[in-house]
Amino acid sequence: MSKGTVALAMSGGVDSSVSAYILKERGYDVIGIYMDLWRDEREEYCNKSAAEDARRVAEKLDIPFHVINIEKKFKDNVIDYFIDEYLSGRTPNPCVACNRTIKFEAFFNAAKEFGADFMATGHYCKIEERNGRKVIVKAEDDKKDQTYMMYNLKQYQLERTIMPCGEYKKDYIREIAENIGLDVYNKKDSQEICFIPDNDHGGFIKRNYKSKVSEGNFVDKKGNIIGKHKGIIYYTIGQRKGLGIALGKPAYVIDINPITNEVVIGDEEDIFRTELIARDVNFIPFDKLEKSMELEAKVRYSAKPSKATIIPLENNKVKVVFQNKQRAITKGQSVVFYDKDMLVGGGIIEEIV
């Protein structure tokens, strides 16, 4: 007897491909869906290749396969946001934006239109029930854990979402793929932003919005001009390489001012801070933070969680006070909170205090 119908987001990669197999083995009826998100002349072949990989896997596993076009929604909510953030002197997190608006909104709604009871992805996270609520827990494979990008999810989404890969190590996922004859078993993991395969975000922005990128001044902490920069989109807090200025000592980006089009340069000690304000905060184990909590938090995907106090503010904001100084806290990035293995929530870094 079927456990229900699952619409699986298939990317053509090994994780979503093996997810299809696992779900079938568990007794679900699986529908494979590839999302056509973005293309230009440089990326079109890559998109076709990924879609064909997904289609071949679906045929091999004998599951229905569909391609849906979400280009406009992706452009409006991810591409435009990505570019606007860089032009505003912030460093965006497109994967967080994509999860919130595309994978767990647009795809979630598409799954319902296909008559699915659940949706599934190849993300490395676990969904459990604790104290009567669905929560997100760190993946079995700590090196592949993707909970940092999931803090925006709501209860209604978690109740209908399955993430099979979260329960396994990545090596085992590849082993399954090879054993069942999937030719994507050795396909490389994507390391870059999906719509910028060459990882040159500055070039991408300049190709699409050339008129908005202009040179400006490097200034020191006192406002003295110390050089010329090629456009604020090319810089982020804590950056040392590629500045193109020689000061006789290591120089770091410590602030970006989009109004004056200036990049502020300082010393390494200037990029270590302990406090920030985050906006658009979402919590998963509860609806609202009523009082301060002692948790762990991290300010980038690759960082280790560090002890911090999370203090509720008005307008869906929080203040985060770390016990130890954090390197290069960056406006536009996400700060994410944990209680041991459980994802508690997160928000967008708005201000560094």
Curated annotation (Swiss-Prot):
Main location: cytoplasm
Disulfide links within the chain: 98-194
Gene Ontology terms for molecular function: ATP binding; tRNA binding; tRNA-uridine 2-sulfurtransferase activity
Record-listed ATP binding positions: 9-16, 35, 122
Record: active site: 98 (nucleophile), 194 (cysteine persulfide intermediate)
EC number, UniProt record: 2.8.1.13
Subcellular localization(s) per the UniProt record: Cytoplasm
Keyword hit for Chaperone: no
Region (Interaction with tRNA): 144-146, 300-301
Annotated catalysed reactions: S-sulfanyl-L-cysteinyl-[protein] + uridine(34) in tRNA + AH2 + ATP = 2-thiouridine(34) in tRNA + L-cysteinyl-[protein] + A + AMP + diphosphate + H(+)
Entry keyword set: ATP-binding, Cytoplasm, Disulfide bond, Nucleotide-binding, RNA-binding, Transferase, tRNA processing, tRNA-binding
Residues under site feature: Interaction with tRNA: 123, 333
GO cellular component terms, A-Z: cytoplasm
InterPro entries per UniProt: MnmA-like, MnmA-like_C, MnmA-like_central, MnmA-like_central_sf, Rossmann-like_a/b/a_fold
GO biological process assignments: tRNA wobble position uridine thiolation
Family: Belongs to the MnmA/TRMU family.
Function field: Catalyzes the 2-thiolation of uridine at the wobble position (U34) of tRNA, leading to the formation of s(2)U34.
Classification via HAMAP family: tRNA_thiouridyl_MnmA
Protein name: tRNA-specific 2-thiouridylase MnmA 1
Organism: Clostridium botulinum (strain Okra / Type B1)
